[in-house]
Amino acid sequence: MKEQCVAMLLAGGKGSRLNALTKNLAKPAVPFGGKYRIIDFALSNCANSGIHHVGVLTQYQPLLLNSYIGIGEPWDLDRNDGGVSILSPYAEASEVKWYKGTASAIYENRHFLKELQPEHVLILSGDHIYKMDYGKMLEYHAEKQADATIAVIEVSWAEAGRFGILHTNDKMEITSFEEKPKYPKSNLASMGVYVFKWSVLEDALERDEKNSASSHDFGKDVIPALLEENKRLNAYPFKGYWKDVGTVRSLWEANMDLLGDHPPLDLFERNWRIYSVSPNLPPQFVADLAEIKESLVSEGCTVYGSVTRSVIFQRVAIGRHSAIKRSVVMHDVSIGEYVEIENAIVSAGIRIPDGFCAKPEDGEVLLITEEYVKKHKVV
């Protein structure tokens, strides 16, 4: 059945709530976990699930993402019987047609799907952190004889209003769907992972495109329309780790979830590896008086100070007598001596001068950029 499934990976999001982190790159391309990018998780899930036909739909700041994915070699997607295809908004004679929404993005690339004529289409978001066997979801979808299946996860009631919320009966059949309700009546959230019968999806997209009142979004328009037509929609309950990293704080939290003896998200799990494009760098160097505790420190780093419960990306230099705690330091950062940083994400490629101090109060998470350093520079 997996050979009859094509995955469509939505990777064109701007991620405006991540502020400066997405100024020059799309949200799925944001670095994560010391050596990865967010999109690595969805691509690795496809590879580990045996799904080898993957279309990646880009839009905002696509150049880095396009070159990063390339022909898909790190994820074993450079193959003759499938492979990865980069699908960008296309140009007509008069203009470039930008995607109007998530459903519009799939509709504009329907010819890619028509050529392959899959039995099922797997719709994925490229900006979530999780490990999932899509094969099991496809089997569940077939067992239920569903027209569409939506992966769902229980979220806290405080967060429920941020997500698409589903209501189901005792057979896990979806009875209603609300997109980001002000007063949620359920805490069963859509993960943005959908399986459709291709025949059902093709028809739904055609009708949605003709609807001038539609915002052309799966959650707001396509799913409610299918429910109104009494199509068979089922919820697939997911019990593993899943994180929407749409804000600076949630991105920081997801990185912190990688740390400890028994982390919520285990990067060292051998039977479900996360693949990435890895630069050819020398090993990390840890000086005699340096100290590293409960941290991930990537290749090419030199550490002379102390690092505690932090994630350090490639080619980071940490000077003597400096202390980094509960922080994420992106690649190519130079940290001077006598620096103190806590509860922060440090943007890539910046220089932190000697004596710099960033220790927020009340559990706040800082985003330290070049502009922030200039504003708070020690005189």
Curated annotation (Swiss-Prot):
Keywords: ATP-binding, Carbohydrate metabolism, Glycogen biosynthesis, Glycogen metabolism, Nucleotide-binding, Nucleotidyltransferase, Transferase. One of its GO terms (biological process) is glycogen biosynthetic process. InterPro entries: ADP-Glc_PPase, ADP_Glu_pyroP_CS, GlgC_bac, GlmU/GlgC-like_hexapep, NTP_transferase_dom, Nucleotide-diphossugar_trans, Trimer_LpxA-like_sf. GO terms for molecular function: ATP binding; glucose-1-phosphate adenylyltransferase activity. It holds the Pfam family Hexapep_GlmU. It is an enzyme of class 2 (transferase). Pathway: Glycan biosynthesis; glycogen biosynthesis. SUPFAM superfamilies: Nucleotide-diphospho-sugar transferases (SSF53448), Trimeric LpxA-like enzymes (SSF51161). It comes from the Bacteria. Its EC number is 2.7.7.27. It catalyses: alpha-D-glucose 1-phosphate + ATP + H(+) = ADP-alpha-D-glucose + diphosphate. Alpha-D-glucose 1-phosphate binds at residues 99, 164, 179-180, 190. Involved in the biosynthesis of ADP-glucose, a building block required for the elongation reactions to produce glycogen. Catalyzes the reaction between ATP and alpha-D-glucose 1-phosphate (G1P) to produce pyrophosphate and ADP-Glc. Belongs to the bacterial/plant glucose-1-phosphate adenylyltransferase family. NCBIfam families: glgC, PRK05293.1. Homotetramer. This is Glucose-1-phosphate adenylyltransferase. It comes from Bacillus licheniformis (strain ATCC 14580 / DSM 13 / JCM 2505 / CCUG 7422 / NBRC 12200 / NCIMB 9375 / NCTC 10341 / NRRL NRS-1264 / Gibson 46).
